[in-house]
Amino acid sequence: MGKTANIDDLESILLGVSTSSGDPSIDLGRLCNALSLLHVTLGEKSWVGLYLVHKGQLILGPFQGTPACEIIAFGKGVVGTCHAKQEPIAIEDVTKIENYICCDAAAKSEICVPIVKDGTPVGVLDIDLPNVHYFSQEEIKFYEGFAKKIADLLH
């Protein structure tokens, strides 16, 4: 995991993510806390957030980090492509990607994981790191598990 966090640190985050209360207002707070916990673990220079499906596009949801792109079309950039393919996409070096949408010049690597609730795609978990980074299969599995926990908090 290079300069960010090790897999044990990440796995401990899953224990800290609360389950749904059934109340959208309470769950929004739980969702924000889960993203904050991941952001702090990865380091202050990271960006962690959600893009949520709304009216045929992905709109910026709760996040931790610098201001970000507010709307991303399906199939565009890493986030939109992740949603279109419905599979995780890990980019070691974003400068090597043709259709990369640069929302933060500090981002050097990115991983996106689809969020699915009750069989329906509802969004994308997006994580940007400030260094070129190879994402291991262990990390990808962690982020998939994190996305499942996040799906439980979405209403």
Model-derived segments and spans:
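A short, aliphatic-rich beta-strand micro-motif
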Residues: 109-116
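Sensory-domain boundary capping and coupling elements
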Residues: 116-129
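Short amphipathic alpha-helical segments
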Residues: 26-30, 34, 74, 138, ...
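Intrinsically disordered, low-complexity terminal regulatory regions
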Residues: 1-63, 67, 154
